[in-house]
Amino acid sequence: MVNIIFNFKNTIILFISFIFAAEDLVYDVSISGTIDMGLPHYIERVVNQAETNGASIIIFEIDTFGGRVDAATQIKDIILDSKIPTVAFINKRAISAGALISLSCDSIYMTSGASIGAATAVSLDGKKASEKVISYMREEMATTAEANNKSREIASAMVDEELYIEYFLSASGDTIT
């Protein structure tokens, strides 16, 4: 199974790269593990370097359970401000802060079995955050989705478990993240 996912990942990256001429420069950036305050500086440096070097596209390979909302918001702003087309490639998961980062990219591609969502804000002790914080995060996700012509409703539902999107339930009626 690992081999199949690895080959599929390489196929997707190869396909995206092939869309551009052979001489075009493609940046492949890994975002994995916990989203922390060191990551925005790295992403900003990579995006600036890609712009300086005339890259045609930046592919962000995402595999994270999330992390700090402030760091993810900074990364989102950097990606939205990029002059280069951006792609989120979700190899396994883009949970919570990872979902926000993915939504900031121009396009999202996922491997079979990958997941995105589960972005309900929580406090440092792991409990559900206040309605004020949830409202902020819901709007942050929604406006980010809208910026790239993605569904505001689906992005909002990733944050607010009270929201119901009928056509995104499994055959058994379970919520799909």
Locate the predicted segments by residue.
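Sec-dependent N-terminal signal peptides
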Residues: 5-21
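Soluble extramembrane regions of membrane proteins in the secretory/endomembrane system
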Residues: 22-177
